[in-house]
Amino acid sequence: MSPATVLDSILEGVRADVAAREASVSLSEIKAAAAAAPPPLDVMAALREPGIGVIAEVKRASPSAGALATIADPAKLAQAYQDGGARIVSVVTEQRRFQGSLDDLDAVRASVSIPVLRKDFVVQPYQIHEARAHGADMLLLIVAALEQSVLVSMLDRTESLGMIALVEVHTEQEADRALKAGAKVIGVNARDLMTLDVDRDCFARIAPGLPSSVIRIAESGVRGTADLLAYAGAGADAVLVGEGLVTSGDPRAAVADLVTAGTHPSCPKPAR
């Protein structure tokens, strides 16, 4: 038997955690909570604003880097991101490897007026209703974690609740699967979740094969304006930034620098 990948071990823990939450709050109860939540915000409008958008992430830790930052007040951090000009705030809610929680999602949703992305390893329909119940407007779906039929059904369910799916890929083959599933927003993660290795040329290789109708988001590897401009030159509509912001010392200023670069007249524009 081949050794489990990093992704396999993460998913094993996620499935156990979802089962525990569902034992406490049933699927019917979480569906009712989702139905009662305020309607989701318009993610596509936010992503289609002029310039290269910044999705700023509340992220305490990662499997590759370990602990990143002590975030005592995720609401305050999210407000700083919004004040800096972020289009969307991403909240990592996976607890074992990333030290996130649904409490973080609740706090962020209550503190900002821009769309919120729930970033987790979604493997059960329960998590989709859970995301909506806790105020998410957007939800991460990772192609590598889902068989094709499941990806299609998860994407359909996400959109049926009024949310937008950020469909994450790392290879050209995964990008093809995302397109066949009907993804409107595709994120290219430079990090291979099987090994945690980083391929910084990943976005530039995959983006040209995506139709212009698809919103393209570059994930991982943005440390400053030079990285944003490089991704913009390769066709990105937005960048998702986590580690570079939570370790910056001044998250509002760090976001503002990226936003300024992304909206500068000299910044490359996506082909539309």
UniProtKB/Swiss-Prot annotation:
Name recorded for this polypeptide: Indole-3-glycerol phosphate synthase
Domain of life of the native organism: Bacteria
Record's keyword annotation contains Lyase: yes
InterPro entries xrefs: Aldolase_TIM, Indole-3-glycerol_P_synth, Indole-3-glycerol_P_synth_dom, Indole-3-GlycerolPSynthase_CS, RibuloseP-bd_barrel
Keyword hit for Amino-acid biosynthesis: yes
Alphabetical keyword list: Amino-acid biosynthesis, Aromatic amino acid biosynthesis, Decarboxylase, Lyase, Tryptophan biosynthesis
Alphabetical list of HAMAP family matching this protein: IGPS_B
Pathway: Amino-acid biosynthesis; L-tryptophan biosynthesis; L-tryptophan from chorismate: step 4/5
